Design a protein with these regions (language model features):
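Non-membrane alpha-helical segments in proteins
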Residues: 1-9, 42-47
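Soluble extracytoplasmic domains of inner/organellar membrane proteins
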Residues: 13-14, 22-137
Length: 137
């Protein structure tokens, strides 16, 4: 828990690389339960997505994808978060906003999220709002 508090302090000071190092230390611990790994990976990925958007900086996409890959597919409770994060990183990877409409992989990911009964309505609503924004620009 203290490392997670340190991570937040580093993020508040814009010390993102230090935060990533601490996340990697936590996530590489051998004795952690897969649920705990998933929760920490999700938290880290969302924080890095936020940083990428806030600072218009895509340098952390590979780290985000690494964190996403640590979310166990057998943990149904986290599939909505995992799919939303995949969707968000796909958007961050676009060359420009107008290429959204022509990206079949991204549109397919959107459809899978919206049609998946195991994904919460909250996540679906967030993804739907983002989708509508990109469709109408």
């Amino acid at each position: 828990l203290s490392k997670l508090e340190l991570i937040n302090k580093h993020i508040e000071k814009n010390e993102f690389d230090e935060s990533i190092e601490l996340y990697n230390e936590i996530l590489s611990s051998k004795d952690l339960d897969s649920n705990y790994i998933a929760v920490v990976a999700i938290k880290g990925a969302y924080q890095l997505v936020d940083i990428a958007i806030k600072y218009n900086n895509n340098e952390y996409i590979n780290v985000i994808n690494k964190f996403i890959s640590l979310i166990d597919d057998d943990l149904d409770n986290y599939q909505g978060n995992k799919n939303e994060l995949l969707y968000l990183t796909s958007i961050l990877s676009l060359n420009d906003d107008s290429s959204y409409k022509n990206n079949s992989e991204l549109l397919s990911l959107y459809e899978n999220i919206i049609s998946n009964d195991n994904i919460s309505s909250t996540i679906k609503e967030r993804v739907k709002k983002i989708h509508e924004f990109y469709i109408f620009i």
